[in-house]
Design a protein with these regions (language model features):
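Short acidic/glycine- and proline-prone juxtamembrane loop motifs at membrane-interface regions
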Residues: 1, 126-134
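Transmembrane-helix motifs of polytopic, lipid-linked glycan transferases
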Residues: 82-102, 140-144
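Interfacial juxtamembrane loops and adjacent helix segments
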Residues: 20-83
């Protein structure tokens, strides 16, 4: 389970502003997932432990945070998962809108059902990790770009602004979303 790493990383960044634990992923989704933990001011981060100072000590830091320094582990994990569940619901709604835009309501409802019942989304749509946030913002960026390309006669900065914001959210979610830049470029040429 690497969930404790994401939770500890997000809370450490939110409380200290120090990105030292965010070596693998940008802090956006990790920080978003721990926002409900602000309702628990008694939570302690092990910043007094040597693992805070060591670059390779972040696994130990996360284990200490979740299993030793704090005692309400179930509540910490539950609250950290809530924002990811909402991102999963948002992904379903974007999938619905995508299908509705291209094929109408007859396709949108089954698309929503298939998306929300898809085993990978059901499995990962509740974990406090960066996967769902990256999926949501990458899919939303692709959808917005596709709509822009379909109606290229109305290219205006106001129509590009939401695309740029959502693309920035995708890049802020997970580093692997940068791999979609060439895909989006190829789609633009089609």
């Amino acid at each position: 389970m690497d969930e404790q790493n994401h939770i500890a990383r997000g809370l450490a960044f939110l409380r200290t502003g120090d990105p030292r634990l965010s070596l693998e992923h940008p802090p956006l989704i990790n920080t978003l997932s721990v926002l409900p933990l602000l309702t628990m001011p008694e939570l302690r981060l092990p910043t007094d432990h040597p693992s805070w100072e060591r670059r390779e000590g972040w696994y130990e830091f996360a284990d200490l945070f979740l299993w030793q320094y704090n005692h309400d582990t179930a509540r910490i994990v539950f609250l950290s998962r809530l924002p990811i569940v909402f991102l999963t619901i948002a992904l379903g709604l974007v999938g619905y809108r995508f299908a509705f835009h291209f094929w109408g309501r007859a396709a949108a409802v089954p698309a929503l059902a298939l998306l929300l019942l898809e085993p990978n989304l059901m499995a990962h749509g509740r974990y406090a990790t960066t996967d769902l946030g990256a999926t949501l913002f990458t899919f939303l960026t692709t959808f917005l770009l596709w709509r822009l390309w379909l109606d290229s006669s109305r290219w205006h900065w106001r129509r590009w602004l939401p695309v740029a914001v959502v693309m920035g959210l995708a890049f802020g979610s997970k580093l692997s979303t940068l791999g979609f830049v060439p895909i989006w470029a190829v789609l633009a040429l089609l």
